[in-house]
């Protein structure tokens, strides 16, 4: 977003509050522009030149979009709103862009690991779209040792049957049409991480419903734990559960390059 904009819109854009709440904050005299209090929500500001300060929030530079990597703990829904606990509830209330953030993709409630949270709809769409075949890496713990022959099957791609009957109510009509037939998975990369051959690193380039669990389930294995450790060039690294960090410039540029946005 460039050029002159209203002050209340500016506050909404940086995630300080909703538009209605932003108006209340401004009228209450809690906002300064270039060191002076402003009471008019329609006051015009230049994001590239003016300094806007909001009482109770750290000074937040204006930017078009926000990009974070987030460690989703087990037990939370990958959604912005739900009856059950969601990832948004874990984020700091003064996180820049919070009101407009959404997850680019999902992780099951019982899974953990890396999510990308953003306000950039086009980037999120490309992360999730099968056309771009963005690699995602997981650490997977199985209930029993995997055989070399099964590793080879996964590396060549396997046919997945329809999801079990219990899963069907969870799917939208469109999603049901996408999984209610047999389709071969794209070749996966498998790396054995432990001598007992139960702990693996699995890299896939598609995001079908419960893909990892269904791949191993087809071969007779149960996934005991699932942790995503990378999405393309973005790594989970040393992030702690429920922690969010802005993507580095290098991470963002590399991600956009892979997704054809540069």
Residue ranges, per PLM feature:
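Basic, flexible Lys/Arg- and Gly-enriched helix-loop patches that mediate nucleic-acid binding at interfaces
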Residues: 2-165, 175-262
């Amino acid at each position: 977003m460039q050029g002159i904009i209203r002050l209340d819109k500016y506050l909404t854009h940086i995630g300080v509050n909703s538009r209605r709440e932003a108006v209340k904050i401004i009228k209450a005299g809690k906002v300064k522009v270039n060191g002076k209090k402003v009471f008019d929500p329609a006051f015009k500001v230049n994001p590239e030149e003016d300094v806007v300060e909001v009482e109770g929030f750290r000074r937040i530079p204006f930017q078009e979009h926000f990009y974070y990597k987030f460690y989703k703990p087990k037990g939370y829904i990958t959604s912005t709103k739900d009856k059950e606990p969601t990832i948004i509830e874990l984020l700091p209330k003064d996180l820049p862009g919070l009101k407009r953030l959404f997850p680019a993709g999902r992780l099951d409630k019982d899974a953990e690991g890396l999510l990308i949270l953003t306000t950039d709809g086009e980037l999120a769409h490309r992360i999730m779209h099968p056309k771009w075949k963005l690699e995602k890496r997981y650490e997977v713990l199985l209930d029993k040792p995997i055989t070399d022959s099964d590793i080879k099957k996964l590396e060549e791609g396997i046919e997945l049957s329809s999801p079990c009957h219990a899963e069907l109510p969870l799917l939208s009509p469109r999603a049901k049409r996408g999984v209610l037939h047999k389709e071969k998975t794209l070749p996966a990369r498998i790396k054995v991480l432990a001598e007992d051959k139960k702990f693996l690193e699995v890299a896939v380039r598609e995001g079908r419903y419960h893909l990892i669990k269904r791949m191993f389930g087809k071969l007779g294995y149960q996934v005991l734990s699932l942790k995503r450790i990378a999405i393309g060039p973005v790594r989970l690294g040393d992030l702690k559960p429920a922690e969010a960090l802005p993507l580095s410039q290098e991470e963002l540029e590399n991600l956009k390059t892979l997704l054809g946005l540069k």
